[in-house]
From Swiss-Prot:
Originating gene: RPS13
Subunit structure: Part of the small ribosomal subunit.
Species of the source: Triticum aestivum
GO biological process per UniProt: translation
Database matches in PANTHER family: 30S RIBOSOMAL PROTEIN S13/40S RIBOSOMAL PROTEIN S18 (PTHR10871), SMALL RIBOSOMAL SUBUNIT PROTEIN US13M (PTHR10871:SF8)
Name recorded for this polypeptide: Small ribosomal subunit protein uS13m
UniProt xrefs under Gene3D superfamilies: 1.10.8.50, 30s ribosomal protein s13, domain 2 (4.10.910.10)
Length: 116
């Protein structure tokens, strides 16, 4: 089992499938990444050389927004909404649904867990 950009990948997994498990990389970006590096479509993670793995990590760090950057950006957006007292920011603080979902019967358990 190896880790690439913080995502765990199994040795018998195809490269395109393993790369989609990284946050910020979907199926299309995984295919583009594979083509740019010249990696075959059916090659598995355990068949990659150390050099190819380093190339994958380097290309992901260079071109794509990865896990920790996405999480940091999301958190900053939520903090900004809270600081300017937007409705969505207040709902985030309360732990209530943001997008108009029903709260009388649904989302009760989420509200109970936050109140404790």
């Amino acid at each position: 089992m190896s880790y690439i950009s913080g995502a765990r990948s199994l040795p018998d997994e195809q490269v395109r499938i393993a790369s989609t498990k990284m946050d910020g990389i979907g199926p299309k970006k995984a295919i583009q990444l594979r083509y740019r590096l010249g990696i075959s479509g059916n090659i598995k993670m355990n068949e990659l050389t150390k050099y190819q793995i380093d190339q994958i990590e380097q290309m992901i760090a260079q071109d794509h927004v990865v896990h920790w950057e996405l999480k940091r950006g999301e958190r900053a957006d939520i903090e900004r909404l809270i600081s300017i007292s937007r409705y969505r920011g207040i709902r985030h603080q309360d732990g209530s649904p943001l997008r108009g979902q029903r709260t009388h019967t649904n989302a009760r358990t989420a509200r109970k867990q936050i109140r404790k």
